[in-house]
Swiss-Prot record:
InterPro entries tied to this protein: GTP-CH-I_C/QueF, GTP-CH-I_N, GTP_CycHdrlase_I, GTP_CycHdrlase_I_CS, GTP_CycHdrlase_I_dom
GO biological process, alphabetically ordered: one-carbon metabolic process; tetrahydrobiopterin biosynthetic process; tetrahydrofolate biosynthetic process
Organism, scientific name: Yersinia pestis
Assembly and binders: Toroid-shaped homodecamer, composed of two pentamers of five dimers.
GO cellular component: cytoplasm
Catalytic activity: GTP + H2O = 7,8-dihydroneopterin 3'-triphosphate + formate + H(+)
Cystine pairings recorded for this chain: none
Residues the entry annotates as binding Zn(2+): C109, H112, C180
Protein name as catalogued: GTP cyclohydrolase 1
A Pfam family of this chain: GTP_cyclohydroI
Protein family per UniProt: Belongs to the GTP cyclohydrolase I family.
Lineage: Bacteria, Pseudomonadati, Pseudomonadota, Gammaproteobacteria, Enterobacterales
Length: 220
């Protein structure tokens, strides 16, 4: 992790200190080598499923999956992909809640490697800095691009923003459909899971907490 940005390193260390980091091994192979290895293993998996990889529809599937894993849906495992963060001095002395609603996220259940599909609402009360609004979306997407459990994902986003913004006054709520529930097992096609993580005033002040929860419930 020698080439990490300062912000990526701060967030990674904060998550480690709190026991909230995704279980990770120290990286040993570069991205291209990992893709080559994954492609070989996926070829074997497909053979074991009795799929005919000489068919032109399936022939390139192992390579596609390997590229998708490393470059896309699991790209958040590599902190070199942590978004560039823009912080602006809070010269306007903004001290009211800033909320970004309906942030689209797609993640992967770490137990079955199937889709988690949902939306996040993130709020914070600025202290010394404000953050570019799109950066909140990018932070959500970074941590979603990993094998995840929703509870940890919610807390990772919270702690990352607390670390970057220098304030505990952050709140995160995620509402998501888990395809490990929808497409297998119980096969419940209508249920969704909501997780919330609150810090600072969002936890200690009932009024602030209720204002955030109203924003989460607002759809009009």
């Amino acid at each position: 992790m020698s080439s990490l940005s300062k912000e990526a390193e701060l967030v990674h260390q904060a998550l480690l200190a709190r026991g909230l980091e995704t279980p990770l091994r120290k990286p040993e192979l570069d991205a291209e080598t990992r893709k080559t290895r994954i492609q070989a293993h996926m070829t074997e998996v497909m053979h074991l499923l009795n799929l005919d990889l000489t068919d032109d529809s399936l022939a390139d599937t192992p390579r596609r999956i390997a590229k998708m894993y490393v470059d896309e849906i699991f790209s958040g495992l590599d902190y070199e992909n942590f978004p560039k963060i823009t912080l602006i001095q809070n010269k306007m002395k903004v001290d009211e809640m800033v909320t970004v609603r309906d942030i689209t996220l797609t993640s992967t259940c770490e137990h079955h490697f199937v889709t988690i599909d949902g939306k996040a609402t993130v709020a914070y009360i600025p202290k010394d800095s404000v953050i570019g609004l799109s950066k909140i979306n990018r932070i959500v997407q970074f941590f979603a691009q990993r094998p995840q459990v929703q509870e940890r994902l919610t807390q990772q986003i919270l702690l990352a923003l607390q670390t970057l913004l220098g304030t505990n006054n952050v709140a995160v709520s995620i509402d998501a459909v888990h395809y490990c529930v929808k497409a297998r097992g119980i096969r419940d096609a209508t249920s969704a899971t909501t997780t919330t993580s609150l810090g600072g005033l969002f936890k200690s002040s009932q009024n602030t907490r209720q204002e955030f929860l109203r924003a989460v419930r607002h759809h009009g």
